[in-house]
Design a protein with these regions (language model features):
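Glycine-centric low-complexity repeats
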Residues: 1-165
Length: 165
């Protein structure tokens, strides 16, 4: 299930739960909860689960939660699941930062043994003081997935790095 949202103005978002293993398609990771209104970090997205069977497809990673408006880092995206006989799951997106804070890193794409690797998730962006999140690495497969792009840095910060192909 999805992580719950932060329940006050100073509370961080709760992480999303991991997806359950599937006989064909793995369960998707839950989204990370958003932080409280003003202050707090976004919750991390849950990991996608393994997809089993001859054509198993990995579950997608959950997206990272958004930080509070003023202070806080974005949540990291969850990793995509392994596709046992099929495609790997996509990595989750990194969450957006507050005015002060770093963007969340994107999740790595899952590997697929019988099909395409999962795409890495894009890093979350920063606004004022903070660096963009790094993009998730691509999953291996036939063909490999696409690497996630780094998030935009704040006015006083650097852009995140792209994931590895």
């Amino acid at each position: 299930g999805n992580g719950g949202n932060g329940f006050s103005q100073t509370t961080a978002g709760v992480a999303g739960g991991a997806g359950g293993v599937g006989s064909t398609t793995g369960g998707a990771g839950g989204a990370g909860g958003n932080a409280g209104l003003l202050v707090g970090a976004g919750g991390a997205g849950g990991a996608g689960a393994l997809g089993g069977g001859a054509t198993g497809v990995g579950g997608a990673g959950g997206n990272g939660g958004t930080a509070g408006l003023l202070f806080g880092a974005g949540g990291a995206g969850g990793a995509g699941g392994f596709g046992f006989g099929g495609a790997g799951g996509a990595g989750g997106l990194g969450g957006k930062a507050g005015l002060i804070g770093d963007g969340g890193d994107g999740g790595a794409g899952g590997n697929g043994t019988g099909a395409k690797g999962g795409d890495g998730g894009a890093g979350g962006g920063a606004i004022l003081v903070g660096n963009g999140g790094n993009g998730g690495n691509a999953g291996s497969g036939t063909p490999n997935g696409s690497a996630g792009t780094g998030g935009a840095g704040g006015l006083l910060g650097k852009n995140g790095m792209n994931g590895l192909p």
